């Protein structure tokens, strides 16, 4: 009798083990996540499994991704487009008449803005707001673009929407954005930002967005003088100077540009 109970216990234990074991199968649907899908016999839930390093290196579309990113993301883009099925835990519902700014070109070139708005947009820049890089490139800080847009359209009257996935290569983050003002698509531009290690990717995505905003503002005439060769030369003569400096650590000497009202800063002296 004891031996019979022992055999039944072993059979029951084996059955439980078989129910809990998992298998790995490849997805066949076009909408499936890249890589294998892990399925459980006692559950209908499926979870994506990231590709291994060897799998990630096989695809030609993954060659531009760094090996570290491949191991974590399976060679997929950093971000993907949200849909009505996965946005905000399925709380989003498509409303008739909604505009999908990811693909729509609604309002582009449809009508001009009011005269006051146009005046605020093309207002000449204050020389005090313009900065210059050590290599001589003049630019307007990104926050100044936002202030100009807020002044012209009002806070909440404009926005920047993604128009593509975020692409991460071994050294660069890039994504396409569209500028929406008062319900109209104004401009589309691709932002880009370099990064030096994978820890800097989140910061690079924000820099990519800022770069796209600056490029979109060119179509509104914001800071248009920054691309005018005559203005650039005059600004450098009136407000900037060149100085020979020495790098604190490498001891190398070079000539850099800086504003006349600024002092040489670290790492130069």
From Swiss-Prot:
One of its GO terms (biological process) is recombinational repair. One of its GO terms (cellular component) is mitochondrial chromosome. The keyword Transit peptide applies. One of its GO terms (molecular function) is DNA binding. Residues 1-30 form a transit peptide. The keyword Metal-binding does not apply. Pfam families: Mgm101p. It is found in: Mitochondrion matrix, Mitochondrion nucleoid. Its main location: mitochondrion. Keywords: DNA damage, DNA repair, DNA-binding, Mitochondrion, Mitochondrion nucleoid, Transit peptide. Belongs to the MGM101 family. Performs an essential function in the repair of oxidatively damaged mtDNA that is required for the maintenance of the mitochondrial genome. Binds to DNA. This is Mitochondrial genome maintenance protein MGM101. It comes from Saccharomyces cerevisiae (strain ATCC 204508 / S288c) (Baker's yeast).
């Amino acid at each position: 009798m004891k031996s019979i109970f022992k055999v039944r216990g072993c059979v029951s234990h084996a059955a439980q083990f078989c129910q809990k074991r998992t298998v790995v199968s490849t997805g066949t649907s076009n909408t499936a996540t890249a890589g294998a899908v892990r399925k459980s016999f006692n559950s209908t839930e499926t979870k994506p499994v990231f590709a291994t390093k060897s799998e990630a290196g096989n695809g030609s579309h993954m060659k531009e991704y760094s090996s570290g990113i491949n191991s974590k993301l399976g060679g997929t883009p950093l971000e993907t487009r949200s849909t009505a099925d996965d946005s905000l835990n399925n709380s989003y519902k498509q409303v008739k008449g909604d505009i999908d700014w990811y693909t729509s070109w609604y309002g582009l070139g449809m009508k001009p803005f009011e005269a006051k708005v146009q005046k605020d947009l093309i207002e000449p820049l204050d020389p005090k707001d313009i900065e210059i890089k050590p290599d001589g490139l003049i630019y307007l800080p990104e926050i100044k673009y936002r202030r100009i847009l807020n002044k012209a359209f009002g806070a909440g009257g404009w926005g920047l929407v993604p128009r593509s996935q975020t692409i991460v290569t071994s050294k660069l983050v890039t994504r396409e954005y569209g500028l929406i003002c008062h319900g109209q698509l104004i401009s589309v531009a691709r932002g880009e930002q370099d990064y030096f290690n994978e820890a800097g990717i989140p910061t690079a995505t924000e820099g990519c967005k800022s770069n796209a905003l600056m490029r979109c503002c060119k179509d509104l005439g914001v800071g248009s003088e920054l691309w005018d060769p005559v203005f650039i030369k005059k600004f450098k003569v009136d407000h900037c100077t060149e100085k020979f400096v020495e790098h604190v650590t490498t001891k190398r000497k070079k000539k850099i540009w800086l504003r006349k009202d600024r002092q040489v800063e670290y790492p130069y002296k």
